[in-house]
């Protein structure tokens, strides 16, 4: 064997060593990641725990079982039709045990944003949700538009007023509490606020500021003050895009339930960590993998 041939063979062998060493390292890293304990569960509400005033199958008992594990529980929701207190009362009325501090909603995040930015918005939100926001300053012109789920407010004159506020000054903000395409009611799917947000964007030539899911900050802020990394958390939800894809993009595990607004033709990319029939089965999976 010549010196040149020997040197070439050495390089090939060295490449193989590096290849298999890296392959083993990556594999070990993946296994370690999968075996990391679940320390927190972020749970969607509408469509996951309940549909209107009806809990999903065995959801009330499943939540009790999950609490017994000691896992941190936060309810992360884009629900914007009602104030946090009204939402809390309604959930308790249908059997769920939870505290107001456990609800992390896009509505409350939007309230904090309005306060922080010292805005004087025109609100396209329900009358009940409006009570969470600070009062308008009648001495100042409106300088922004806040949009939530407000079926009774989405009529032409209101939308036209919002359009003109945005059009009057390029610095006026369009704040989308969330951009849901649709949500689940007892009588089927219904339009969410997303189409109205996009309509205002198109007509006024502006881009909205998204507050709720799937905003990365919204998921991370649910864990504020907790010594828990996103890799130790699961997100349970019915919305393929906002719940599952949004959470997994941040680094959480995603448990897709087939209740609520779930549609089999809407596929998550990347796929969810696991897909189950309902919230109760999601809890079973967590108990098996804790």
Placement of each model-derived feature along the sequence:
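Asp-based, Mg2+/Mn2+-dependent phosphohydrolase catalytic module
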Residues: 33-43, 50-69, 82-104, 108-290
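Non-catalytic pre-domain segments flanking phosphatase-related domains
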Residues: 2-7, 13-43
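Conserved phosphate/oxyanion-binding catalytic-loop motifs
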Residues: 79
